[in-house]
């Protein structure tokens, strides 16, 4: 997974053994290196914690550190909790690209015809044969040329000459990293299974065959498992740890269907702890609500029938989970419940949260940590190409912005609260645990080109990292625990040389509202003259920070 040289490409695959619980799956990236390292003896680690800042590339981590007063221009950096970990590397994130009958390659295609929506049910594309050559294409979705499907390869690849040997050294083609960029489903699949696949894939290979995830491997070895996220629990990154479906938007389905993420999480994989967003009371509204009108519900991430089963039977439901949801004093209730549950007795915890107007996510933290943007549309800034974000919340009659924010903060835990609760439950397992914690809203802020929200969500994620590091120090230390902090993919953010000074002078909120890229000190995309020229991912290597028992094999 480490980028050590640009002179030669090779594949590095880790063997799935008992020791895989240490490796976590993150070490199975296709890498750039010019030498082989000797085999490293693998020893058993009790607890493995993987923390993913969704979309948190090198520039985003640097912006977060700068907001705390630390300025650097290369390397690991300092100022954030995850930057205190002993080890640092870079990992590529690309996936596959496949052309169907029309000959146009796309990163979103499997090797099946997709004539049947059920995972794995469609026939294979006629004449398809996997070709391992690199094929970045010339469009964001991949391909773009009418070519014979077997004329070029099915791996996107990464060229350090075009993209840069590292994130702080630009390559010679600023458009290149837009081409065939990965999505969170594809990259999460690789993180959890060690297999490259296509955008949209939730732990299935290019033939839509299910892959064994590290969560399942850990469970098979008697360990408790957990999924924690600031976005919906059946979104791509958490979903790929505990489901196998061909499309990431298969969030939930009515019982007893299983070709969806949430039902597989709850009925097949059954992690000990599932905590995150996706509550139906988070539907966005473009205007305040009149007297007598109930807050909008949006059953996108959970069906009405699934929610009814859980909410009406929080302690005894068909899924055998203790169910918590957003409500008064949510963080306190979560902590109290977590303290009572014991995985050795078969207890499991499911918590579903989300702020009104946040499209399923927890209250969003701004750079100063005041959650002042809670309830505002997450996708307003980039969509308006540089104008100020939306200022309208789905207020109830008589509710003010101040009381709205206070209510949402009270009725929803933070990512840090969720992490503490997960550790409280999982740490009771005498055999140890595997836990994934995702700062998913970092990615949402970056899609919006919203610097203020992006820095805030990075710092929010870092609080959870600090909590985890402190927990490790007090629970067996680094001799019993392994912590890996990384991103699943990057975004196309560039900080100008004057960014640090402008950030100190004007603050992130002002730089977010500024439409001129020079005055804003940053821009999104390949054109330095356009501040909001891109609102999507980039095919750049991402940082990996890690420390603990078993880290030598990474």
Feature-to-residue mapping (PLM):
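General structural concept
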Residues: 199-207, 227
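Hydrophobic alpha-helical membrane-insertion segments, chiefly the h-region
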Residues: 23-32
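Anion (oxyanion) recognition and catalysis
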Residues: 219
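Ser/Thr/Pro/Gly-rich low-complexity linker/stalk segments immediately outside membranes or between
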Residues: 34-44
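A post-motif C-terminal structural segment
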Residues: 42-48, 53-182, 187-189, 230, ...
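Glycine-rich anion/phosphate-binding loops
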Residues: 204-212, 255
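N-terminal Sec-pathway targeting helices
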Residues: 7-20
